[in-house]
Amino acid sequence: MSEELQQKLRSQLWTVANTLRGNMSASDFMYFTLGFIFYKYLSEKIELYANEILEEDHITFKEVWNGKDEELKQDVKEECIQNLGYFIEPEYLYSTIIELISKKENILPSLERSLKKIEDSTIGQDSEDDFGGLFSDLDLASPKLGKTADDKNKLISDVLIALNGIDFGLQEAGDIDILGDAYEYMISQFAAGAGKKAGEFYTPQEVSQILAEIVITGKVRLKDVFDPTCGSGSLLLRTAKSGKADSIFGQEKNCLLYTSPSPRDMRRS
């Protein structure tokens, strides 16, 4: 990712975060912002993938779901779950929620169903543990979002609209790098405002680099790297990269951080 694109992405992300900043603490709006970023990513990822596998049939993902070919729907769903680990029907996509916003509708019930549907799609699958409780920290009924239902709806709608203008480069080979950079940048910014509490989910890059250098001192290559409280995974991955580790292991009780791009990459290693 070019430095220009990186700076543009970070500027857009921080603009989104500022929409929530006045309503809640840094750690609270971190969970909302990162949760919605990941929802957008998952939605765009699956729509792109589904359209690609349907290309030879000259039909789009949304067109299939508007049709009556139940066998084709099931085939698409199974292939998505097998290769992506989850499934989202078109009516629960991020883009569909944006359409509801444009119609001035109350999106909160639909948004809540959409987030739950993503988790439910993995039940009984190998990816169930990865997605279980993914959006559990997104309390759309929280009084921190506003006093009335209309206030909450407007605030969340504003955040989703702002995020909608962000391009995560899904059609590029480095899409995970772009999303991972977005996560690390946002977490670092939230950490700056969270004070001492930030230590539970983020280790500053400078500290991570020093710790990584200490760990690999006198070693040419690391066999395994393990972090029992890996948070967002930034320290673990930095150490693994510096030490050219063969395997990476981490534990994290916070669902949102556990399922962020860094730990997901970590589990694939």
Q: Over which residues does each language-model region extend?
A:
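A ubiquitous, low-specificity "background" feature that marks scattered single residues
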Residues: L34, P143-L145, G233, E252, ...
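Conserved S-adenosyl-L-methionine
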Residues: K197-P261
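Positively charged, low-complexity/disordered segments
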Residues: S262-D265, S269
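Non-catalytic, mostly N-terminal accessory regions of nucleic-acid modification and defense proteins
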Residues: M1-V215
